[in-house]
Amino acid sequence: MIKVAPSLLSADFSCLASEIRKVQKAGADLLHVDVMDGHFVPNITIGPVVVKYMRGVTKLPLDVHLMIKNPEKYIDAFVASGSDMITVHIEAIANAKLKTQSAKLRKKGIKFGVSLNPATPLSKIKPILKYVDFVLVMSVNPGFGGQSFIPGALPKIKQLRAIFKGDIAVDGGINDLTAKKVIKAGANVLAAGSYIFKAKDTKKAIERIRNAR
């Protein structure tokens, strides 16, 4: 089953609640929330307080993507704010700490995922795959929305699908054309920002991604 996760980085933050309700009504399966610290990536976005208010306006699962250094220091705060899913970057956390967080979060019923940047080889996450519920493959260099899809993500997705049975999510440059390619490669969760939030018809944009073949 293909799931569509509107990426709130591309939403209008002056009316975030209505933006969330709009994509929820249009058929979103979950919401992708990018958290950036200005260190791991150059941009700065939001913290646990904003996630808490997001939780108050939707029942959709919140996938909080921590693009931050030392994510283990902040995971508890984001869980307390109402996150349903937590994603950390393999480049930002040691394997031992990742395993510890995995055990903690799974006990709480929180889904735990790992993400890898375009330049990071798949071999980097192979030792920890059994500790995560999903993998997020970045198809742009993280930090800003509206970037173009990096085709090098496709063989990585295909190789990952051959060894991993959990959800494979893709984030970056997703539209109706790139959606076809990543789904064919083996991805089943697609995070899309600009394509959804800038569309004249939000529902049709989500449907085009979900039904891309």
Language-model features: where?
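Short glycine-rich anion-binding loops that position phosphate/pyrophosphate groups of nucleotides
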Residues: 140-142
